[in-house]
Amino acid sequence: VLYAIIPVILDGVERKLKAALQSRIGPPVTQTIYDLLKLVLVKEIKTQPTILYVYLSLTSSIVTGLASLYYITLYALRGDQVDMFYALALFAITTSTHTVTPLIVPNPYSFIGGIREVVLGVVNEAALITSISLYTIMAQRSMLKSTQWVIIIAVALVALTAFIASYVASSRVPFDIAEAEPEVASGIFVEFSGSVLALNIYSLLLRRLIVKLLVLAPTVGLLYGFSLTGLLVVLLLLPATWVTYATVAVILGRSRVDVAPLTLAKIYITLILISITVLLVQAYV
């Protein structure tokens, strides 16, 4: 229940923060809750059969997302790599389902936006899964406790890759290439309104929560170990991480559709190859 409420509250905090950074008064922290309730109460305009598939797709995305959060919690408590790999697999399903949903909407603008998301997702999800898997293995072996600078560099590079990939997965500027940022949750569903938009917005917010916990859990595990205390530290760091991502989004400018995926691919390949090379050299020296 806590995980179901947190993303809605933190999104309200993010909107308030953005308004403050842009010298605006902004909406109340509870505005996102009001928006979702308002959309749920709005009567659907479209009666196309497609809307049923959209409902099923978004609902399955939310359910698998909540299941992913369950395994992340187990990982933070026990430190079992299998739990994190389950969480990554479920998150990949969540992201894939959410990403391909616009492709079944009978509207060219929605389809184009969906294709852009697919292209970006192909690049980013591979880096996210690879970096967090490496990060999890390092956390399991407590490699950060080593005083060897080579190990510290490798851990830092993997952590940097994981945090970059998690930021991109949150669909914030400049990686909101499907639509302009205010329309990330609604533009690709231009033909629908009401509860469909509410489900899509909530699915997006849930993904933003998951990607932050995916990188925070192994980070805290490296520093504090895996226990109930570690889980509490993760939850305490969550609002700060969310605010940091929101601040970065305000500072950064937009990117071209053809530039963002290619640039990300170059960055990810470079960082991951260097970190793996460093670890291999350390293992055989």
Identify what each model region corresponds to.
Residues 1-285:
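Alpha-helical transmembrane segments of multi-pass membrane proteins predominantly involved
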